[in-house]
């Protein structure tokens, strides 16, 4: 499974959204109806799934699914 598909699976589970709604350009708050707490929980789930740490400064920059994928690819 590639990074996007793995991230997508976490997003679907954490945000309770349909898998078809999760695209690389999907914005968590605007497109997937996440609130700030959802985003924090999503970041924590991604950290656990990929065994990485996403500092708060970096987490604040993550707005879309592709932002997460790029961060994970650069830091794994």
From Swiss-Prot:
Q: Does the keyword Heme apply?
A: no
Care to name a GO molecular-function term for this sequence? acyl carrier activity
Task: Spell out the post-translational modification annotation for this entry.
Answer: 4'-phosphopantetheine is transferred from CoA to a specific serine of apo-ACP by AcpS. This modification is essential for activity because fatty acids are bound in thioester linkage to the sulfhydryl of the prosthetic group.
Locate the O-(pantetheine 4'-phosphoryl)serine modifications and list their residues.
36
Q: Which GO terms describe its cellular component?
A: cytosol; membrane
The record's listing under PROSITE patterns reads: CARRIER, PHOSPHOPANTETHEINE
**Major localisation:** cytoplasm
Subcellular localization: Cytoplasm
Q: Name one GO biological process term.
A: lipid A biosynthetic process
Instruction: Enumerate the SUPFAM superfamilies for this protein.
Output: ACP-like (SSF47336)
Kindly tell me the pathway this chain contributes to. Answer: Lipid metabolism; fatty acid biosynthesis
**Which keywords does UniProt give here?**
Cytoplasm, Fatty acid biosynthesis, Fatty acid metabolism, Lipid biosynthesis, Lipid metabolism, Phosphopantetheine, Phosphoprotein
Q: Where is the Carrier domain?
A: 1-76
Q: Which family is this sequence assigned to?
A: Belongs to the acyl carrier protein (ACP) family.
Q: Which PANTHER family match?
A: ACYL CARRIER PROTEIN, CARRIER DOMAIN-CONTAINING PROTEIN
UniProt function note = Carrier of the growing fatty acid chain in fatty acid biosynthesis.
User: Which named protein is this?
Assistant: Acyl carrier protein
Q: Name the source organism.
A: Helicobacter hepaticus (strain ATCC 51449 / 3B1)
């Amino acid at each position: 499974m590639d990074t996007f598909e793995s991230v997508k699976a976490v997003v679907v589970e954490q945000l309770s959204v349909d898998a078809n709604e999760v695209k690389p350009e999907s914005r968590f708050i605007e497109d997937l109806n996440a609130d700030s707490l959802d985003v924090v929980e999503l970041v924590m789930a991604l950290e656990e799934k990929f065994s990485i740490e996403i500092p708060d400064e970096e987490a604040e920059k993550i707005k879309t699914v592709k932002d997460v994928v790029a961060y994970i690819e650069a830091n794994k």
